Amino acid sequence: MSDYGIALGMIETRGLVPAIEAADAMTKAAEVRLVSREFVGGGYVTVLVRGETGAVNAAVRAGADACERVGDGLVAAHIIARPHKEVEPVLTMEQK
């Protein structure tokens, strides 16, 4: 199944615990699919979710709030409503 046209939500954290907390909150808050977790380096972890734009927006908000409750774990939170088709290969590079 192609994810082209489906929203992408991203949360980057300092450490694994805030990342797990964010992933848990995001998947509980809205109908989104957890698609990837990347260890970026230096203790940073990025969590990616996909779904309809409204659901991804709600999920990323919930994930960011959960991260902030854990401590100083939130680095960034961002949503791309419809990633361009040229961006899709970049998103799947690390998953292979």
From Swiss-Prot:
UniProt KW Protein transport keyword: no
- State the coiled-coil residue ranges: none
Task: Name the principal localization, coarsely classed.
Answer: other
Tell me which InterPro entries the record gives.
Bact_microcomp_CS, BMC_dom, BMC_shell, CcmK-like_sf, CcmK/CsoS1_BMC
The transmembrane residues are: none
Domain (BMC) ranges:
7-92
User: Any one Gene Ontology biological process term?
Assistant: carbon fixation
CDD domains recorded for this chain? BMC_CsoS1 (cd07058)
One of the record's GO cellular component terms: carboxysome
The answer to whether keyword ATP-binding applies is no
Q: Which family does it belong to?
A: Belongs to the bacterial microcompartments protein family. CsoS1 subfamily.
Assembly, per entry: Homohexamer with a small central pore. Forms a CsoS2-CsoS1-RuBisCO complex.
User: How does the entry describe the domains?
Assistant: The tight homohexamer forms a small pore which is positively charged.
What function does the entry list? One of shell proteins of the carboxysome, a polyhedral inclusion where RuBisCO (ribulose bisphosphate carboxylase, ccbL-ccbS) is sequestered. Assembles into hexamers which make sheets that form the facets of the polyhedral carboxysome. The shell probably limits the diffusion of CO(2) into and out of the carboxysome.
Please identify the protein, giving its name as recorded.
Carboxysome shell protein CsoS1A
Q: Which organism is it from?
A: Hydrogenovibrio crunogenus (strain DSM 25203 / XCL-2) (Thiomicrospira crunogena)
The record lists the lineage as:
Bacteria, Pseudomonadati, Pseudomonadota, Gammaproteobacteria, Thiotrichales
What gene is this protein translated from? csoS1A
